[in-house]
From Swiss-Prot:
Designated name of the protein: Keratin-associated protein 5-2
Family: Belongs to the KRTAP type 5 family.
Gene designation: Krtap5-2
Organism from which the protein derives: Mus musculus (Mouse)
Record has Repeat as a keyword: yes
Superkingdom: Eukaryota
GO CC, alphabetical: intermediate filament
Sequence repeats: 21-24, 27-30, 33-36, 134-137, 144-147, 159-162, 169-172, 179-182
Entry keyword Thylakoid: no
Amino acid sequence: MSCCGCSGGCGSSCGGCGSNCCKPVCCCKPVCCCVPACSCSSCGDCKGGCGSCGGCKGGCGSCGGCKGGCGSCGGCKGGCGSCGGCGSCGGCKGGCSSCGGCGSCGGCKGGCGSCGGCGSCGGCGSCGCCQSSCCKPCCCQSSCCKPCCCQSSCCQSSCCKPCCCQSSCCKPCCCQSSCCAPVCCQCKI
């Protein structure tokens, strides 16, 4: 019998089902395996489409990496985002926004926030954001960054009013405004 337009039947001369075939086995089936829309079910949604008889072509596209990881044949699972690819964190979890990739906190969790790489981890905490410059706007929210919040670079902004008067950490800047009246206004100079 003919298979997907192969005049030679199901033997070795059939030559496969052509560029529209998305199944590893094309011939010798009761139902024609060639379909108009390429599904690439065996390779995890190839970005570049399917080759002949189930193979992937195009790989992960031009963005430099897959959002969600790659399948075993080089295809993208979930497509590619605009973040420039996935780094050593093993894939962007939830997708990347415009942060430029995955930071050291184990991936962009639910997208990247304004902190510059650490999304829903709050900006601070175990991912090490607090020691870099990315958390100045947010490091005094809740109790995430009390150890580093009173550094001069943070204290001079408005982010540290709730915590910058602990002990003597902020004497040089504490007396600005009224953030530190109970403790630090002895530092008038």
